[in-house]
């Protein structure tokens, strides 16, 4: 371990694979960010950003946004599709449409919308009335594309139609049969020609956590017979020319490229058939599904993807192009709604470790000669560990069984508290000793080695709410890369489990990227008694903010944008303070003014003097105006 360096930590945390070239660990052991791919040497030290924010009065937890990463991801997506179009000889265009449901924060939408000079090639997608109104106000350029998905009522459809009068190109995607009649009615009433799209239910579907959002059992989309009925309805009204867009969606976070290949082939057949039936389809929207490799394993795990961005683009472009060449059809504009791939990398949640409980060897002596038999048995097992060829698995099983018997006898009143405590400490010592003796390379030892690694890991209490900031980690077991921000030039000799500050046993991180796999504990260096430890949760820019809930009334964290200036230096802008206690109380209809009145009445008790009364009221006011998370005094 004496030759350990930051390069070793890079491998342990698998940073080169999930970091997409944005994240690194420098020689001093600090995590860095290179947000602008055109300036790879311009690096930001995350610890420096946190220190600068602290000097300005902001404590952790804080969400750091890197708008330059958003721009880099937009460029990467356009470059991948541009190269695929050029290599394949595809005659249509590519249009990137950002579905704002992935992250509706105003600054995120603005950064994405403004990040490409050729604005008509970058559109927005809405899935509800509030999202549509937001999208209509964000796009200012003539001809900006807006795709309208989701369930729709007449008001939604009217807003979409009126968007065309504002100069936008608004596609209303019919996702259930009843929507067509509403579109026809409202367009006739407003005398606005609609741009209609249709979402096809494919037989193909992606595997993984979100597979139910695609395929024939999806809650959205039209079956083959329903699409035929839609075409005949439009043909009968002389409005078949309004049907301009074909849409499908395999599901979010598609891990296996073969699922994408199958979906594209099936979509291509739908395109060919719709053209054969007279529909003037100009746009094929392949939806979302472009995966993010959260683990860095390049695998078919639901938190990974076994393909690159360029491979995805090649499969989409070549797949649609092959159908067009086979049937001599015009090459449609290709739209992808790759929101997760655009936004995931740009945000990092940073928080501090407020305390830790480690598992260490206990200094205990042999039981007295007249001690109960069960304690004598446990001590014998402990001594057996020092024999020439100990049976490690048997010793562990016996120790677990003996401890169970101790707890039973304690409950029955046969053992006292001191004896129970002695047994617990001896069992802990046995586990620690076994952990050092087990060989993980030995297949027979591997399961127990993993069990003890988790059992003996440090409990690290992190100043954040898993339910607010990483809801997918709790709800669906999503893996997010996490690592300390400093000290990584030192050997990672400890294992930890991160626990949040909510009053819920589910509030802990259960999965950690470790090498080319995922483990149940986090590798960590040893920190000094007065050395502060900050940890970063990476790739949290997609879905997490909007899905977060208010468990224990922990609300939004502080947020700040971290830019690179013209000289490649860190420039922190657009700082937004997190929710205060009084704001959170209002969310659940608790009026802070009523709390103040009740406090006034309670402290008016004659037993309290004026100074004490004032101190209590001042403390209340500080609490109401303060950050919901733990703060240093």
UniProtKB/Swiss-Prot annotation:
Its cofactor is Mg(2+); pyridoxal 5'-phosphate. GO terms for molecular function: arginine decarboxylase activity; metal ion binding. Keywords: Decarboxylase, Lyase, Magnesium, Metal-binding, Polyamine biosynthesis, Pyridoxal phosphate, Spermidine biosynthesis. Signal peptide: none annotated. Gene3D superfamilies: 1.10.287.3440, 1.20.58.930, Alanine racemase, Lyase, Ornithine Decarboxylase, Chain A, domain 1. Substrate binds at residues 284-294. NCBIfam families: PRK05354.1 (NF003763), speA (TIGR01273). Catalyzes the biosynthesis of agmatine from arginine. This is Biosynthetic arginine decarboxylase. It comes from Aeromonas hydrophila subsp. hydrophila (strain ATCC 7966 / DSM 30187 / BCRC 13018 / CCUG 14551 / JCM 1027 / KCTC 2358 / NCIMB 9240 / NCTC 8049).
